[in-house]
């Protein structure tokens, strides 16, 4: 995957989720088809930490079941960082076992970036797909 596709409204929603959970990291699953995000599923950070996040296993199972029931996939994991929007050493470990796009939002820089892991971390583009009418 070379890009992940989000609407402006989805980007704003993710930024709002990140800001609403300050000072802690926020997290969400992005459900969709191929590279296009169709649904944002906010998750609770059970770590309640400004530097890490974890999701309750039952909530993870619910997200995967919901995606399957709607004909979608979990295409990305979103979370916020208090600093730069780049993967931490902890993120890198989890990216290896969760081979989806990782979208990171910096609450200090109001900047969002997306990454994939395939033997190494690679930044990918975020494509805005607003429909003009």
Residue ranges of model-derived segments:
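Conserved beta-strand-loop surface patch within small alpha/beta domains used
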Residues: 1-74, 82-133
